[in-house]
Amino acid sequence: MRNNRDGSGDLWPAAAGVMRSLVVSIHDVSPVTRLICNRILEELADLGIKRTSLLVIPNYHHRAPVADDQAFQQWLIDRVQSGHEPVLHGYYHQRMRSENDSLFFRLTTEVYTAGEGEFFDLSFEEASNRLKSGLADLSFLSGKISGFIAPAWLLGKEAERAVRQCGFLYTTRVGSVIRFNNNDEIVSRSLVWSTRARWRVAASLAWNRALGRRVRDCSLVRIGIHPPDYEHAAAWKQIVKLLHELSVERRAAPYGDLAA
């Protein structure tokens, strides 16, 4: 389903770059997670999935600056040259708690996302500054970074305006891909796992088992992988099974192909 941002919508029978596509995104790519992300990419390649979107955090939790890590830079350069897409994924991937936060804000940013909803309520100015800093930190990469995806998909109204003004071509939410250049929205629910607690794992496995069946006939299927998923046997087994089944009749492509 394609929805125009003005509220109109129509079925998407054969849109360029969308038909029978599979987008696999690796979240939280940083110097801290480089080794495990590399193992994930190796296993995906064994499944025939050789192009993904890599969601890069410029300075994870203020303690892993990409700009100071030449080994990570070279690793990312090599991955991009082999066909993977770099995507800006916040700046710190962390939102500091405010004593003025409402109950809704606390539930959203601390329970739902464990304090990582960085772009949930940033001002336009602060969001712009972090976006520009992130692009500067990733300037060692050749080519334009066309996508920005907020941590936990929590992108406030002013922050989204900053993303548009900075020239990004798209962003995503958990339920859609928003293409700024086309002023439209591809409705597609991302499959994503949570392994922070036992009950979250059980809920994720049940939810994605059902959702995996529902999305089989959709034009676009999205799979979001976080580094901890790889270390949880049940979650990773389900991910591999889904990808094996979905990749048979779908073209694996990064988000950037949808916005081109």
Segments (PLM) and residue ranges:
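Hydrophobic faces of well-ordered beta-strands that scaffold small-molecule active sites
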Residues: L22-I26, T52-L54, P86-H89, I145-F148, ...
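Active-site gating loops and adjacent loop-to-helix segments of metal-dependent hydrolytic enzymes
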Residues: N100-F124
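Catalytic domains of cell-wall/extracellular-matrix polysaccharide-remodeling enzymes
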Residues: E118-S194, E231, W236
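Active-site beta->alpha N-cap acidic-glycine motif
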Residues: R2-E85, F140
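C-terminal domain-boundary segment and adjacent tail
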Residues: L11-A16, T52-V56, Y170, L220, ...
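Short, solvent-exposed beta-strand-terminating loops
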Residues: P86-F104
